[in-house]
Amino acid sequence: MRFLSFILVLVAITPGRAADLKDLPANTWMEIKYATDQPADPEAKGEFARQGWNKIVYDPDGKRVLFYDRWIDKKHGGYTIYGNCLFGLDPGAARLSPIKIDNWTKMETKQGGYRTLVLPENEREPTPCPRHVYHAFDYVPALKSVFICNGANQTALRDGKLVGHDLCDGAWQLDLASNKWTLLAAAGGPPNRLDDAMAYCPVTHSLIYAGFERQLWVFDLAKKEWRKAKQSPPQRTAFGETIFYDPPRQRMLILGGGRLDAWKTPPAAEFRELHAFDPKTESVERLADAPTAFYATHLAYDSKRDLFFAAAVFDQKEHPSGMFRYDPKGNAWSEVKLASPIPPHKNWFGWTQMCYDSHDDCLIGKVNDKFFALRYVAGE
């Protein structure tokens, strides 16, 4: 998707200066100039290389932003377009850490291109196949764990045979205390049709998966069981739909999505749809349409102000561009007036990623390999 996004402010947050985040100018995107930590394993020393097709979430326990993307080093095969590592960004300390690198590597082929295959370490300690996780990724505070489900990797090998996305089927849990992955082998889960979304619902202690044709699945974290939800939004193609939890109202918000690349042809009204899913009754309600088209869009929930924030910039002016807030109390959208422009993207998958840092009371934005912070002030 060819979003431009948040324009770089001339000032930046210096590494190690946590106080900067609590004293940001109002409604101004400021870059966080971070330093990158290295793994203890000398063979795994490398660098972060953003690939996109993922989601960022805030971990209030670790006071950090979590996301799954690409770590490039010799041991794990260098560059591919697929994520292979859980990262943590400490916004206050301005440090990025590779928390867990998967035990997979890359092999070049004689015909050109590459294949993804396991390292010997994966026999002793299984890890998920590298992938685009899309939005099927979340942190569960009650379990101090990260969960992923399904995803894409068309280069994946099993026993020397190309099986592609099939190696990304199913859900995994990363226990952050032990730093170990566990495959959650449970039948009846959502099919892996790519570009899906998932979010944690604390009121039912479950993961709600928004998948193929906008159908919803529920994963009971206590029973480790999947089942289809009683009701889902009206069935249709919904690549790039996203789902987020609304804490005060104890419901899930399901935003946007549609036919692949159909947002390029206005009005593309399906990309503006917003629905609420009640996890207790498993009923669905249509809410106010968004002011622009949303594809793989983050709805960042600001718990202090009880507002959701989202952003999108369309370089061909197919739809309105800007940063928008959704007031769940009044079921109303409005545009946020910024003191600085939104930093730019330079590639087609440059959608804006955002989450709310409750410790520092600011929004954290990710644009390619850059991170930004913004302190929202109403009326300025």
Question: Language-model segments: what does each one mean?
Answer:
Residues F3-A12:
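Sec-dependent N-terminal signal peptides
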Residues T14-A18:
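Sec/Tat signal peptide C-region and signal peptidase I cleavage site
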